[in-house]
């Protein structure tokens, strides 16, 4: 049992029965939202979304490894300096200690809607420290604290059809890990559901659609989205450039 900064309540793993109940609730909520969307369209109305991200963000490199409270295997897996995102008031919003070396790619997924076909699902991309509450890609408030960032693809099961432009996500899990490398979808999802009814997630946008002068860097690439772009080395000597959305959201219904 452990605590997250900004909360006085201990975090405990949900029971299997509770997690199944949560998944049933999410299904009901999805069907309710879908019916509402169809009804609205039939009435000739269009949905409108308010752009809430009016801040400007900057990036700086901060020397020093991740928090000492992390397991040694995690601390050794990531860089000994962080990419720090500063908000419009020049205050630190988040620190990101990215993996010093990702596993070599296996079993590329070339399905439409997948921008990062050679990223191994479930792999840890970074350690994140949020300094203050911040909304994720689904506009969910995420509390200050320390998290692991894992790569996960939105399931192609019909339940998320048309929800977002791309299926690639950086999801948050608890700051503990039996494995930092690739792992199955269900295992990663269960870890993410330990934190919230729906996984906290930031979008991974195609890197070639995010133009930046130098890496690592941060830029606004749409009116309401900001992304950190950088290249990460791999064990086989290759590298992969990612663009992780750190501000702004996209949820089509």
Protein language model features and the residues they cover:
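Bacterial N-terminal signal peptides
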Residues: 28-40
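A short tyrosine-centered beta-strand micro-motif
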Residues: 145-152
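Extracytoplasmic
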Residues: 123-125, 142-144, 165-167
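Primarily secretory-pathway and cell-envelope proteins
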Residues: 45-116, 172-253
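Bacterial N-terminal signal peptides that target proteins for export
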Residues: 5-6, 13-30
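N-terminal post-signal-peptidase region of extra-cytosolic proteins
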Residues: 110-114, 125-133
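Short consensus segments that form the blades of beta-propeller domains
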Residues: 118, 159-163
